[in-house]
Amino acid sequence: MRDHVEFCYYVIIYSLEKFQQRSKQFGISLFIFFLATAAVTVIVPTLLGVSQRGFFCDDDSIRYEYRKDTITAVQLMLYNLVLNAATVLFVEYYRMQKVESNINNPRYRWRNNHLHVLFVRLLTYFGYSQIGFVMNIALNIVTKHVVGRLRPHFLDVCKLANDTCVTGDSHRYITDYTCTGPPELVLEARKSFYSGHSAVSLYCATWSALYIQARLGPVLNNRIVVPISQTLMFMIGLGISFSRITDNKHHWSDVLVGIFIGIFLAVYTCTFWTDLFSNNSTESETQPLLLPRPPRTPRNSEDEERHRLDAVLPSTDSSIVFEATGPQDSDTILLPVPQSA
Protein backbone atom coordinates (compact mmCIF):
# COMPACT_ATOMS: atom_id res chain seq x y z
CA MET A 1 0.00 0.00 0.00
CA ARG A 2 2.74 2.47 0.92
CA ASP A 3 4.64 1.59 -2.26
CA HIS A 4 1.59 2.38 -4.35
CA VAL A 5 1.10 5.71 -2.59
CA GLU A 6 4.71 6.67 -3.28
CA PHE A 7 4.37 5.55 -6.89
CA CYS A 8 1.27 7.71 -7.43
CA TYR A 9 2.95 10.71 -5.87
CA TYR A 10 6.03 10.54 -8.08
CA VAL A 11 3.97 9.93 -11.22
CA ILE A 12 1.90 13.05 -10.68
CA ILE A 13 4.79 15.25 -9.59
CA TYR A 14 6.83 14.12 -12.57
CA SER A 15 4.03 14.89 -15.01
CA LEU A 16 2.99 18.25 -13.61
CA GLU A 17 5.91 20.04 -12.00
CA LYS A 18 7.27 21.31 -15.34
CA PHE A 19 4.03 21.45 -17.27
CA GLN A 20 2.14 24.12 -15.34
CA GLN A 21 2.99 27.58 -14.18
CA ARG A 22 1.80 26.67 -10.72
CA SER A 23 3.80 23.45 -10.63
CA LYS A 24 5.62 24.18 -7.37
CA GLN A 25 2.48 25.13 -5.47
CA PHE A 26 0.60 22.18 -6.94
CA GLY A 27 3.46 19.82 -6.12
CA ILE A 28 3.46 20.98 -2.51
CA SER A 29 -0.30 20.40 -2.31
CA LEU A 30 0.08 16.91 -3.73
CA PHE A 31 2.91 16.12 -1.33
CA ILE A 32 0.80 17.19 1.64
CA PHE A 33 -2.17 15.21 0.33
CA PHE A 34 -0.28 11.95 -0.17
CA LEU A 35 1.65 12.37 3.07
CA ALA A 36 -1.58 12.82 5.01
CA THR A 37 -3.18 9.89 3.19
CA ALA A 38 -0.24 7.59 3.88
CA ALA A 39 -0.16 8.67 7.51
CA VAL A 40 -3.86 7.99 7.99
CA THR A 41 -3.61 4.65 6.19
CA VAL A 42 -0.72 3.44 8.36
CA ILE A 43 -1.16 5.21 11.70
CA VAL A 44 -4.91 4.78 12.25
CA PRO A 45 -4.96 0.98 11.78
CA THR A 46 -1.84 0.66 13.94
CA LEU A 47 -3.26 2.70 16.81
CA LEU A 48 -6.82 1.40 16.71
CA GLY A 49 -6.34 -2.12 15.45
CA VAL A 50 -9.36 -4.02 14.19
CA SER A 51 -12.59 -3.62 16.12
CA GLN A 52 -13.43 -6.82 18.05
CA ARG A 53 -17.13 -7.35 17.47
CA GLY A 54 -19.26 -10.08 18.93
CA PHE A 55 -21.90 -12.24 17.26
CA PHE A 56 -25.05 -14.25 17.83
CA CYS A 57 -24.61 -18.01 17.95
CA ASP A 58 -27.57 -18.53 15.62
CA ASP A 59 -26.41 -15.94 13.06
CA ASP A 60 -26.46 -17.82 9.78
CA SER A 61 -24.98 -14.89 7.84
CA ILE A 62 -21.47 -15.65 9.16
CA ARG A 63 -21.60 -19.44 8.79
CA TYR A 64 -20.59 -19.70 5.12
CA GLU A 65 -17.52 -21.63 4.03
CA TYR A 66 -14.21 -19.96 3.31
CA ARG A 67 -13.34 -19.60 -0.38
CA LYS A 68 -10.37 -18.19 -2.24
CA ASP A 69 -10.66 -14.90 -4.07
CA THR A 70 -11.87 -15.02 -7.66
CA ILE A 71 -10.19 -11.64 -8.19
CA THR A 72 -7.11 -11.19 -6.02
CA ALA A 73 -5.83 -7.86 -4.71
CA VAL A 74 -2.93 -7.92 -7.19
CA GLN A 75 -5.32 -8.49 -10.09
CA LEU A 76 -7.47 -5.62 -8.85
CA MET A 77 -4.45 -3.28 -8.83
CA LEU A 78 -3.54 -4.34 -12.36
CA TYR A 79 -7.13 -3.75 -13.43
CA ASN A 80 -6.94 -0.21 -12.08
CA LEU A 81 -3.61 0.56 -13.75
CA VAL A 82 -4.37 -1.02 -17.12
CA LEU A 83 -7.93 0.29 -17.51
CA ASN A 84 -7.16 3.91 -16.67
CA ALA A 85 -3.84 4.06 -18.53
CA ALA A 86 -5.17 2.31 -21.64
CA THR A 87 -8.25 4.54 -21.72
CA VAL A 88 -6.21 7.74 -21.51
CA LEU A 89 -3.70 6.52 -24.10
CA PHE A 90 -6.35 5.54 -26.63
CA VAL A 91 -8.49 8.66 -26.22
CA GLU A 92 -5.60 11.12 -26.38
CA TYR A 93 -4.04 9.36 -29.36
CA TYR A 94 -7.37 9.51 -31.19
CA ARG A 95 -7.76 13.20 -30.43
CA MET A 96 -4.28 13.98 -31.68
CA GLN A 97 -4.70 12.01 -34.91
CA LYS A 98 -8.32 12.82 -35.81
CA VAL A 99 -9.22 16.04 -34.03
CA GLU A 100 -6.03 18.01 -33.48
CA SER A 101 -4.02 16.98 -36.54
CA ASN A 102 -4.16 20.52 -37.97
CA ILE A 103 -3.48 22.27 -34.67
CA ASN A 104 -0.04 23.09 -33.37
CA ASN A 105 0.28 21.17 -30.14
CA PRO A 106 2.29 22.74 -27.32
CA ARG A 107 5.85 21.65 -26.74
CA TYR A 108 6.88 20.47 -23.30
CA ARG A 109 10.26 20.31 -21.67
CA TRP A 110 11.54 18.56 -18.60
CA ARG A 111 15.16 19.04 -17.57
CA ASN A 112 16.00 20.46 -21.01
CA ASN A 113 14.48 17.43 -22.74
CA HIS A 114 11.54 17.63 -25.13
CA LEU A 115 8.56 15.47 -24.17
CA HIS A 116 5.89 14.29 -26.55
CA VAL A 117 2.47 15.78 -25.86
CA LEU A 118 0.90 12.30 -25.77
CA PHE A 119 3.30 11.25 -23.03
CA VAL A 120 2.51 14.40 -21.07
CA ARG A 121 -1.24 13.91 -21.31
CA LEU A 122 -0.94 10.24 -20.37
CA LEU A 123 0.97 11.03 -17.19
CA THR A 124 -1.24 14.00 -16.34
CA TYR A 125 -4.65 12.35 -16.66
CA PHE A 126 -3.47 9.00 -15.34
CA GLY A 127 -1.92 10.77 -12.37
CA TYR A 128 -5.20 12.52 -11.65
CA SER A 129 -7.01 9.17 -11.73
CA GLN A 130 -4.64 7.79 -9.11
CA ILE A 131 -5.47 10.58 -6.69
CA GLY A 132 -9.00 9.25 -6.32
CA PHE A 133 -7.69 5.70 -6.25
CA VAL A 134 -5.44 6.46 -3.27
CA MET A 135 -8.31 8.22 -1.48
CA ASN A 136 -10.44 5.15 -2.13
CA ILE A 137 -7.88 2.76 -0.64
CA ALA A 138 -7.21 4.95 2.39
CA LEU A 139 -10.90 5.40 3.20
CA ASN A 140 -11.54 1.68 2.82
CA ILE A 141 -8.67 0.63 5.10
CA VAL A 142 -9.67 3.02 7.88
CA THR A 143 -13.35 2.03 7.65
CA LYS A 144 -12.58 -1.69 7.81
CA HIS A 145 -10.54 -1.26 10.99
CA VAL A 146 -13.03 1.04 12.69
CA VAL A 147 -16.21 -0.93 11.89
CA GLY A 148 -14.86 -4.48 12.16
CA ARG A 149 -17.88 -6.22 10.65
CA LEU A 150 -17.55 -9.99 10.47
CA ARG A 151 -17.30 -11.59 7.05
CA PRO A 152 -19.75 -14.29 5.95
CA HIS A 153 -17.06 -16.98 6.47
CA PHE A 154 -16.03 -15.77 9.93
CA LEU A 155 -17.04 -18.85 11.90
CA ASP A 156 -15.40 -21.15 9.36
CA VAL A 157 -11.96 -19.56 9.83
CA CYS A 158 -12.40 -18.62 13.50
CA LYS A 159 -12.98 -22.21 14.68
CA LEU A 160 -14.50 -21.36 18.04
CA ALA A 161 -13.75 -23.31 21.17
CA ASN A 162 -16.23 -26.14 21.69
CA ASP A 163 -17.94 -24.59 24.72
CA THR A 164 -18.66 -21.17 23.20
CA CYS A 165 -22.15 -21.75 21.80
CA VAL A 166 -23.31 -24.89 23.63
CA THR A 167 -25.67 -23.16 26.04
CA GLY A 168 -29.41 -23.46 25.65
CA ASP A 169 -29.87 -19.83 24.57
CA SER A 170 -28.71 -19.91 20.94
CA HIS A 171 -29.68 -16.27 20.41
CA ARG A 172 -27.23 -15.08 23.06
CA TYR A 173 -24.80 -12.38 21.93
CA ILE A 174 -21.22 -13.59 22.39
CA THR A 175 -18.50 -11.05 23.11
CA ASP A 176 -16.02 -13.18 25.07
CA TYR A 177 -14.75 -15.90 22.75
CA THR A 178 -11.51 -17.37 21.48
CA CYS A 179 -10.69 -18.24 17.89
CA THR A 180 -8.39 -21.21 17.30
CA GLY A 181 -8.03 -20.73 13.54
CA PRO A 182 -5.12 -19.12 11.68
CA PRO A 183 -4.62 -15.62 13.15
CA GLU A 184 -4.13 -13.93 9.76
CA LEU A 185 -7.38 -15.39 8.41
CA VAL A 186 -9.25 -14.46 11.59
CA LEU A 187 -7.96 -10.90 11.35
CA GLU A 188 -9.07 -10.57 7.73
CA ALA A 189 -12.45 -12.09 8.62
CA ARG A 190 -13.15 -9.00 10.74
CA LYS A 191 -12.90 -6.60 7.78
CA SER A 192 -16.13 -7.09 5.89
CA PHE A 193 -17.45 -3.50 5.74
CA TYR A 194 -17.18 -2.21 3.16
CA SER A 195 -16.04 -4.04 0.02
CA GLY A 196 -12.76 -2.60 -1.25
CA HIS A 197 -13.02 -4.61 -4.47
CA SER A 198 -16.40 -3.04 -5.21
CA ALA A 199 -15.22 0.48 -4.43
CA VAL A 200 -12.05 0.20 -6.54
CA SER A 201 -13.63 -1.57 -9.52
CA LEU A 202 -16.54 0.88 -9.76
CA TYR A 203 -14.22 3.83 -9.21
CA CYS A 204 -12.06 2.77 -12.16
CA ALA A 205 -15.07 2.06 -14.36
CA THR A 206 -16.80 5.34 -13.51
CA TRP A 207 -13.68 7.48 -13.87
CA SER A 208 -12.85 5.94 -17.25
CA ALA A 209 -16.45 6.30 -18.44
CA LEU A 210 -16.59 9.97 -17.44
CA TYR A 211 -13.19 10.59 -19.01
CA ILE A 212 -14.33 9.08 -22.31
CA GLN A 213 -17.54 11.11 -22.18
CA ALA A 214 -15.69 14.37 -21.60
CA ARG A 215 -12.73 13.90 -23.93
CA LEU A 216 -14.10 11.68 -26.69
CA GLY A 217 -17.88 12.13 -26.65
CA PRO A 218 -18.03 15.70 -28.03
CA VAL A 219 -15.61 15.01 -30.92
CA LEU A 220 -16.58 11.48 -31.97
CA ASN A 221 -19.15 11.26 -34.74
CA ASN A 222 -20.04 7.66 -33.93
CA ARG A 223 -22.65 7.58 -31.17
CA ILE A 224 -22.29 3.85 -30.50
CA VAL A 225 -18.64 3.51 -29.53
CA VAL A 226 -18.79 5.61 -26.37
CA PRO A 227 -21.93 4.01 -24.81
CA ILE A 228 -20.71 0.51 -25.63
CA SER A 229 -17.31 1.20 -24.09
CA GLN A 230 -18.88 2.65 -20.97
CA THR A 231 -21.28 -0.28 -20.66
CA LEU A 232 -18.43 -2.80 -20.90
CA MET A 233 -16.51 -0.95 -18.21
CA PHE A 234 -19.46 -1.02 -15.83
CA MET A 235 -20.12 -4.69 -16.59
CA ILE A 236 -16.56 -5.60 -15.63
CA GLY A 237 -16.72 -3.44 -12.51
CA LEU A 238 -20.02 -4.93 -11.39
CA GLY A 239 -18.77 -8.44 -12.16
CA ILE A 240 -15.80 -7.91 -9.85
CA SER A 241 -18.13 -6.51 -7.19
CA PHE A 242 -20.60 -9.39 -7.34
CA SER A 243 -17.79 -11.95 -7.15
CA ARG A 244 -17.22 -10.82 -3.57
CA ILE A 245 -20.68 -12.13 -2.67
CA THR A 246 -20.22 -15.49 -4.39
CA ASP A 247 -16.77 -15.84 -2.78
CA ASN A 248 -18.37 -15.39 0.66
CA LYS A 249 -16.07 -12.44 1.33
CA HIS A 250 -18.73 -9.77 1.85
CA HIS A 251 -22.38 -9.34 2.66
CA TRP A 252 -24.54 -7.83 -0.08
CA SER A 253 -24.79 -4.56 1.84
CA ASP A 254 -20.98 -4.31 1.97
CA VAL A 255 -20.84 -4.61 -1.81
CA LEU A 256 -23.63 -2.08 -2.32
CA VAL A 257 -21.94 0.53 -0.12
CA GLY A 258 -18.63 -0.07 -1.89
CA ILE A 259 -20.28 0.51 -5.26
CA PHE A 260 -21.76 3.84 -4.18
CA ILE A 261 -18.51 5.03 -2.61
CA GLY A 262 -16.51 4.11 -5.71
CA ILE A 263 -18.90 5.99 -7.98
CA PHE A 264 -18.96 9.02 -5.67
CA LEU A 265 -15.16 9.25 -5.49
CA ALA A 266 -14.89 8.95 -9.28
CA VAL A 267 -17.34 11.81 -9.82
CA TYR A 268 -15.56 13.86 -7.15
CA THR A 269 -12.14 13.27 -8.74
CA CYS A 270 -13.34 14.08 -12.25
CA THR A 271 -15.06 17.26 -11.07
CA PHE A 272 -12.66 18.78 -8.56
CA TRP A 273 -9.28 17.25 -9.44
CA THR A 274 -9.25 16.28 -13.10
CA ASP A 275 -11.64 19.15 -13.95
CA LEU A 276 -12.92 17.29 -17.00
CA PHE A 277 -16.18 19.15 -17.41
CA SER A 278 -14.89 22.69 -16.93
CA ASN A 279 -15.31 25.07 -19.85
CA ASN A 280 -11.77 26.29 -19.35
CA SER A 281 -10.27 22.82 -19.71
CA THR A 282 -12.13 22.06 -22.95
CA GLU A 283 -12.11 25.42 -24.66
CA SER A 284 -8.42 26.09 -24.01
CA GLU A 285 -7.48 23.32 -26.43
CA THR A 286 -9.40 24.80 -29.34
CA GLN A 287 -9.24 28.54 -28.83
CA PRO A 288 -6.32 30.48 -30.36
CA LEU A 289 -3.95 32.27 -28.07
CA LEU A 290 -3.84 36.01 -28.84
CA LEU A 291 -0.62 37.89 -28.29
CA PRO A 292 -0.62 41.71 -28.66
CA ARG A 293 1.93 42.96 -31.17
CA PRO A 294 4.52 45.17 -29.47
CA PRO A 295 4.43 48.84 -30.52
CA ARG A 296 6.77 49.89 -33.29
CA THR A 297 9.88 51.89 -32.60
CA PRO A 298 9.31 55.51 -33.77
CA ARG A 299 11.45 56.66 -36.72
CA ASN A 300 10.18 60.24 -37.16
CA SER A 301 7.75 62.71 -35.63
CA GLU A 302 4.69 61.08 -37.23
CA ASP A 303 5.78 57.64 -36.10
CA GLU A 304 6.47 59.01 -32.63
CA GLU A 305 2.91 60.35 -32.37
CA ARG A 306 1.49 57.08 -33.68
CA HIS A 307 3.70 55.16 -31.25
CA ARG A 308 2.38 57.24 -28.37
CA LEU A 309 -1.22 56.53 -29.36
CA ASP A 310 -0.52 52.83 -29.82
CA ALA A 311 0.93 52.65 -26.33
CA VAL A 312 -2.24 54.18 -24.88
CA LEU A 313 -4.78 52.42 -27.10
CA PRO A 314 -3.27 49.23 -28.50
CA SER A 315 -5.15 47.83 -31.46
CA THR A 316 -6.57 44.31 -31.22
CA ASP A 317 -6.46 43.96 -34.99
CA SER A 318 -2.68 43.73 -34.94
CA SER A 319 -2.63 40.67 -32.69
CA ILE A 320 -0.67 37.60 -33.60
CA VAL A 321 -2.70 34.39 -33.54
CA PHE A 322 -0.84 31.35 -32.33
CA GLU A 323 -2.81 28.12 -32.39
CA ALA A 324 -2.15 26.01 -29.33
CA THR A 325 -3.68 23.19 -27.39
CA GLY A 326 -3.53 22.33 -23.75
CA PRO A 327 -3.15 24.66 -20.78
CA GLN A 328 -2.06 28.15 -21.77
CA ASP A 329 0.86 28.49 -19.36
CA SER A 330 4.11 30.23 -20.09
CA ASP A 331 6.03 27.32 -18.60
CA THR A 332 4.47 24.77 -20.89
CA ILE A 333 4.00 26.46 -24.27
CA LEU A 334 6.91 27.82 -26.24
CA LEU A 335 5.52 30.82 -28.10
CA PRO A 336 7.14 32.44 -31.15
CA VAL A 337 8.74 35.81 -30.47
CA PRO A 338 6.92 38.50 -32.51
CA GLN A 339 9.15 40.62 -34.68
CA SER A 340 8.83 44.38 -34.59
CA ALA A 341 7.57 46.07 -37.76
Curated annotation (Swiss-Prot):
GO molecular function, one term: phosphatidate phosphatase activity
Transmembrane helix listed as a keyword: yes
Membrane spanning stretches: 30-50, 71-91, 122-142, 223-243, 257-277
Localization: Membrane
GO biological process, one term: phospholipid metabolic process
GO CC term, one of those recorded: plasma membrane
Membrane topology: Multi-pass membrane protein
Regions of compositional bias (Basic and acidic residues) in chain numbering: 299-308
Key words, A-Z: Glycoprotein, Hydrolase, Membrane, Transmembrane, Transmembrane helix
Pfam families per the UniProt record, alphabetical: PAP2 (PF01569)
Sugar-bearing residue positions: N162
Family, per entry: Belongs to the PA-phosphatase related phosphoesterase family.
Protein name (Swiss-Prot/TrEMBL): Phospholipid phosphatase homolog 1.2 homolog
Species assigned in the record: Caenorhabditis elegans
